[in-house]
Amino acid sequence: MTSARSHLTDLTRFAPLLPGYQPREPQLEMADAVETAIRSGGTLMVEAETGTGKTLAYLVPALLSEGPTLVSTGTKSLQDQLFFKDLPLVRKALGLPRKVALLKGRANYLCPYRLELHQEEARFLTRETVEQMQIVAHWAGRTRTGDIAELQQLPEDAPIWPWVTSTADNCLGTDCPSYQECPLMNARKEAQEADLVVVNHHLFFADAALRGSGAGMELLPSANTVIFDEAHQLPEIAAAFFGDTLSTRQVQELGRDSLSEAGQTTADLATLNQLIASVEKGCLDFRLSLGEMERRAPWSEVCDNEAVMRAGEDLLEALRQLDVFLGPLGKASRGMEACSRRASEHVDCLAAYLQGDQPNRVYWFETFKRTVVLHSTPLSVSAQLRAQRERNPCSWVLTSATLSVGGRFEHIQKRLGLDSADTLRLESPFDFKKQAVFYAPEGLPQPSDPAYTRELTEQMVPVIEAAGGRTFFLFTSHRALREAAEILRTRITYPLLVQGESGRRELLDSFRDKGNAVLLGTSSFWEGIDVRGDALSCVIIDKLPFGSPGDPVAAARIEHINRNGGNAFRDYQLPQAVLALRQGAGRLIRDPQDTGLLVVADPRLLTKSYGKLFVNSLPNMTKTRKLDVVQRFFAYLARQLHGEKPTEKEGQA
């Protein structure tokens, strides 16, 4: 095959499609490495920092190669960007008739069967839901793909979606009467026929878990090459899919679906209603037994509580009775057969959870206002991923802007079971020394001090003023975010956007539109967000992002590492925090023309021995501890923006 390098350096291909396009050496180096991995069937990890052009560096060799390729992303937004923007451009530049397809998880597609099943039911409790059903029904008649992302007038969390999309629990598969017009099945068929399929990590690991279960099922086509973008997310996503989850919402949906399906059979509806009522009561009592507060906690914290265990056993017994009732009805219809299967699976899952004795797993739960979610999560996924890799003798390419810690890949290699992977680290071509200033403020108390957030927020007011708003203020806890929000409401005049008061997409759209806003966010705003230009000129990080000691999975991993002779702080907590800080800091400079200020306020950065690892992991920006330097820097940028000559003092900022 013709080399990717020769195509990327051919200006007649890309320059007409990308104004100002010039091949970059880091991009070419990555393309060479990806091409070698594809040819050899090897495993390659590439850390490609912002600005290296990694998307073209893997898409070009992937499209030039023979055989099908899967490209997996961490987020649906990147998935859509690759399919609708990047791939059409690369295909046009290469002039290759490659077939490409987009495949998402089943919850992203309309289910015609469930739409018809629920459309005429009078169990929609609110006017909002009725109106949403009408919108969906109208759209269903004209959509080609059935991808619910098309219907932008409904939010992602609209209450109608569970009624008109399927889950692995309730999908009837080939037995569904709507199988021929099923958008999900049509998307899978297109994927089977494509040369390159864009998926996401959740779908990839759902498929891997199915294949590993020995069930003889698969969601994705086989591939010669798998490319993971945003690969730093793989360990946590893999852990979720190689574990087990059961929620009271799933159990309640089983009851509702059983009742809907039973209307088309000769089932004893009175008895079924009684059994479903018992299950509903069991779900409610189980939720109440865990206390009013919403929380995440290890099961070991409550498994000796008699009331909790009794409520769990009562729910299990109610589920067993429903399972026994549904068993004979499975022959009545495909829908009832699916409900019967789900009931048996829920019984097995809840029984195993209440037993809670599987080794190398952490059993934990989450409580929400009306729901309990039970989780059984593996402490490590390295063995499963190693087995997955060995079962599939194809090329694996893993890339992200943040894979290494201190320039070394051992941490991510060990977590993924890919110790022998080849590695390549490519630094950003941006001139951070000229584009950005790093500010570590003086005089703050230790982060454990109750006054820390208040004093930090007060110190950041003049920084925000100097930046003219245009700030991401990133927090490691919701409590600190709420405290800072209350202070800033009375201290700044810029638009204040606070996570939790609107959806993530709405907040980001508003931030871009206003041009001088201050956005306060926690973990979901630390990565996967790309705000270029003048709307974002300052990123403030309140603390070094060590994982919460109250997180049950992290706590169990820490205990496991220490119990087996390791050093959990050095081997797990510190590397994870470094990678998280690099992600947060990466929100600032997204473009060669971007400029701005990065604030890492945590005094441990300079007072603790491990602080150097954090500092050295960040881009080499101009560093200061003085507020007046920060103010001169922003004054300098403002004059530049208006075409004025900066003062001598500002030029020295």
Where are these regions (language model features)?
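Walker A/P-loop NTP-binding motif
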Residues: 35-36, 55-68, 85-89
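Conserved RecA-like P-loop NTPase helicase motor core
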Residues: 441-451, 501-606
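A contiguous, basic/glycine-rich beta-loop/short-helix subdomain that forms a polymer-engagement track
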Residues: 162-197, 208-217, 321-444, 451-458, ...
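Conserved helicase motor "Helicase C" RecA-like lobe of SF1/SF2 P-loop NTPases
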Residues: 476-500
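Signature of the SF2 helicase/ATPase Hel1-core->accessory helical subdomain module
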Residues: 64, 80, 85-88, 168-169, ...
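A substrate-engagement module of RecA-like helicase motors
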Residues: 2-17, 67-197, 202-205, 256, ...
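Conserved pre-motif I regulatory segment
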Residues: 2-46
